[in-house]
Structure formats: C-alpha cells, structure tokens
Amino acid sequence: MAGMHRDKCGAASVAGFFRTLCELRPKGLKVRGAMAMVRNSIGSDCYVSDEIITARSGVRVRVGNTDAEGRMAMADVLSQFKDEAVNEVNPYLFTIATLTGHVCLAYGEGYSSIMDNGPARMKKASTLVQAAGDAVGDAFEVSTIRREDYFFSNGPSEYEDLLQCNNLPSVRTPRGHQLAAGFIIRASGLDKHGLDSEKPLCYSHVDIAASSGPYPGVPSGSPIPAFVEAFVTRA
C-alpha cells in the first residue's frame, strides 16, 4: 500500500528511545523493549480475511481486515512481556504504533494519543506522559478505553474468541483508535491483569499515526522526547 513507508515509526521510536538511554545511562531504571515487525505481503504464505489464527496467549483470532496486521504482531509481543512483567517490581507496559487513521481525525496532525488500562489509569500514567510531553513540545491527547472498545472484538461465532477488527477503515469506524487498544489488551491476555485481578499490570497504548511526521518529510521522533522527560528526567 502506498504511503506505508512510515508505518514502522512505532518500532523506530523504540529503537530511538533505547539509543537515548545508551547516551544518558540513567540509574535505577530497568527498561526492556521489542520491535514487532511483520511484512504484510501477498503470496502463498500471506494471511487472509476470515482466517483464524491462534495468538501466543492462546486466544483464537478471526482476521477481519488484513490491513490490521500491526495489532496482531504487537499483541503477541505484549503477551510475552506481560508474562515477564508479573515478576518485576512496579512494571509499566507500553505499545507504540502508527496504528490508525482514526486518531488523525480525532486529534489532528501533530498529536499522539495515549490510553490506559484500568491499573495504569489509577496511577495516572497517561496524564504523567501528557504533562511530560507538554514540557518538551511533544504533545499528547488522552483517550479513554471504554467497555464498548473491549466488547467490539467479541468473536461473532463459536469458532473464534476474538474478531481482529471490522472490514471498514478505522476512519469510518466510531472509536476506531480505542477499539484497537481494546483488541490488543484482549488478544495479549492482558485483560486477565486488570484492577480486579490478583496481579494487576499497568499498560498504556500510544498511537502516533498523527504525530510521527509527514511523508515525504522528516520524521518527528515522537514519542521519544515525552518518554525521556517522563521516565528519565522526572524519574
């Protein structure tokens, strides 16, 4: 698809954040990261709509739209990090992606969107990142994940647990960027670590589709400045 050259800016921001950590060498901060990568090509080994894929978490996912490959890849990586996080001290989990066109309609060019699960909201994770971003010119808007955003991904039949997404573009889907976060939480198994669980885990999803920069043009580097300010400078 034309214009997808910048669809890897989420993974690139993870690399950029770690490059910054290598320069600053902050003490008392443990950070682990991964870059979820997938080449969404046609061919004999491609994936197709209506295919049912079992996620790393064991959840059966029916593919609704092959253009939503990013949330599939991130869900498996998040599932692994979720399993490791339960044994860590005060862990915070994040996913970062140029995920939806919907967020561009919602907030306009230049603004990242951050949205928390229940445990992260209790600790005001999104407002912390938003305030840090304001201080360094890396603007964020806070979105809320509602129950409808979780219910939307209910599997329509007995054969699957979840529906990856509908077959409309996110720009034509109400709550398009929040729905994606709800799916990632459920597909990764992170919904088993909410406020009512024995081991709650803080998780925030960052959609940088509107803030990653123009194409063609120079990438913005968002959300690296906000994350450095929030978790290094202000830590």
Question: Which residue ranges define each predicted feature?
Answer:
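A generic structural signal for tightly packed, nonpolar segments enriched in small/aliphatic residues
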Residues: 1-235
